[in-house]
Amino acid sequence: MADNFNFEFVSPERLLISEKVSEVVIPATEGEMTVMAHHAPTMTVIKPGVVTVKFASGKTGKYVIFGGFADITPERLTLLAESAVPVDELSRDTLMKRIELAKAELDDTENHEHRTKLEQFLNAMTHLNGVLVPA
């Protein structure tokens, strides 16, 4: 049986999770990363995607994250989200609103670095819209 570790998942709106877990899969910018107890210390940027949590009880939870930052130590994972919601609370309207805002910002942006980040965000949001939210 895998060891458990402390997991804090925080967004500006609320504390989503603060409890013992056995495993968390996060959408890091370098690719999906599975975090377990005794993980090497790491700090990474989180891209929009799905966070999958395996709780100490054996239950699994899925959350959509819209970007953020992860601080990983051997005993703890702290996930600071720009915004996040449980998958079952996500609506097509929420995703479409974020996509439209990003498109409008992209149209008004001339900075190449910012345009690239917006294009990556739009790609992730479009993918989530097609995969997670039923028509």
Curated annotation (Swiss-Prot):
Entry GO CC: plasma membrane; proton-transporting ATP synthase complex
Topology in the lipid bilayer: Peripheral membrane protein
Primary location class: membrane
MF annotations from Gene Ontology: ATP binding; proton-transporting ATP synthase activity, rotational mechanism
Pfam families per the UniProt record, alphabetical: ATP-synt_DE_N
Cellular localisation: Cell inner membrane
Presence of keyword Acetylation: no
Keywords, in A-Z order: ATP synthesis, Cell inner membrane, Cell membrane, CF(1), Hydrogen ion transport, Ion transport, Membrane, Transport
Entry similarity comment: Belongs to the ATPase epsilon chain family.
HAMAP family recorded: ATP_synth_epsil_bac
PANTHER family referenced in this protein's UniProt entry, alphabetically: ATP SYNTHASE DELTA/EPSILON CHAIN, ATP SYNTHASE EPSILON CHAIN, CHLOROPLASTIC
Subunit details: F-type ATPases have 2 components, CF(1) - the catalytic core - and CF(0) - the membrane proton channel. CF(1) has five subunits: alpha(3), beta(3), gamma(1), delta(1), epsilon(1). CF(0) has three main subunits: a, b and c.
Function: Produces ATP from ADP in the presence of a proton gradient across the membrane.
Name assigned to this protein: ATP synthase epsilon chain
Organism: Allorhizobium ampelinum (strain ATCC BAA-846 / DSM 112012 / S4)
Gene for this chain: atpC
